[in-house]
């Protein structure tokens, strides 16, 4: 049986997870939605939703984003179904088109001057 990998997360990551999970929990409670109701709408288990609300870093990012969308927490400074998000996606795709497909380390120049 493979050993479980122990990961460490930066302080910034931990704080961002805590913030997002708090926003999700607050929005759910403000909208008077039960954990079971949100979990069913997101297609996840109730225990997964509880882990999301406790800022567990091992939760799938897609599940976290779906729950945020369901309870009305805007992501990336954009309102739900906002053209602003679509514009950001387009700009990112344009930038990626200009960049090389792979990131390669620069090779050391050979000094062959004698």
Question: Which residues does each PLM region occupy?
Answer:
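A short, Lys/Arg-rich alpha-helix, primarily the initiator
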Residues: 2-30
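Short alpha-helical DNA-recognition segment
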Residues: 32-48
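DNA major-groove recognition helix of helix-turn-helix/homeodomain DNA-binding modules
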Residues: 60-78
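Short, charged recognition helix plus adjacent turn
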Residues: 78-114
């Amino acid at each position: 049986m493979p050993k479980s990998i122990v990961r460490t997360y930066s302080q910034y990551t931990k704080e961002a997870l805590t913030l997002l999970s708090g926003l999700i929990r607050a929005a759910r409670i403000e909208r008077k939605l039960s954990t079971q109701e949100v979990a069913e709408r997101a297609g996840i288990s109730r225990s997964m939703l509880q882990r999301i609300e406790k800022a567990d870093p091992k939760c799938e990012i897609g599940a976290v984003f779906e729950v945020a969308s369901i309870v009305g927490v805007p992501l990336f400074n954009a309102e739900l179904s906002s053209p602003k998000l679509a514009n950001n996606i387009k700009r990112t795709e344009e930038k990626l088109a200009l960049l090389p497909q792979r990131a390669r380390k620069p090779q050391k120049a050979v000094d062959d001057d004698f």
